[in-house]
Amino acid sequence: MAIRDIVNYPSEILEQKAQRVERIDAEVQTLIDDMIETMRNAPGVGLAAPQVNAPLRIVVVEYGEPENEDEEPAEKQLFTLINPEISRMSREKEIGTEGCLSFPGILAEVERSLAVTVVAQDRNGDPLKIKAEGWLARIFQHEIDHLNGVLFTERAQKVYEIKPDEETEENPAA
């Protein structure tokens, strides 16, 4: 496993649609392992393959949401999604603050669906169907947008700069 460089905006790869993964081979497995290590090192809650200069439809997400606002986050769950698509989105939406590892020092207020259903393959090629709500749904939408060449700043209602020490648990970098 290796920590890869994260591509920062502006970069063409961030604005291009990623290619479908046709074969899950050793090279793809290495990329997934590297993406997980890179995301954890950043630190972030999600990373799309184009963010490490790989134009493939792969996303890794690691997140644990507290059951109550006063509690510590639950144990984090790791998701590896190959060729993910959002099959359902709730009509109910919410504006939330997002960061992005490819946009250091930038936060944005983005409206997203409160719940989504994601279909994908896991790293073994087995089909997955995940129903997510809240922050996990937001993270999935953000990362899948990366695979479609859509940047969170394009969906933003407000964009603002922050100092590096202002990034918090409430405003994680995705």
Q: Model-derived features: where do they sit?
A:
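Active-site rim/adjacent substrate-binding subdomains
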Residues: M1-Q141, H146-A174
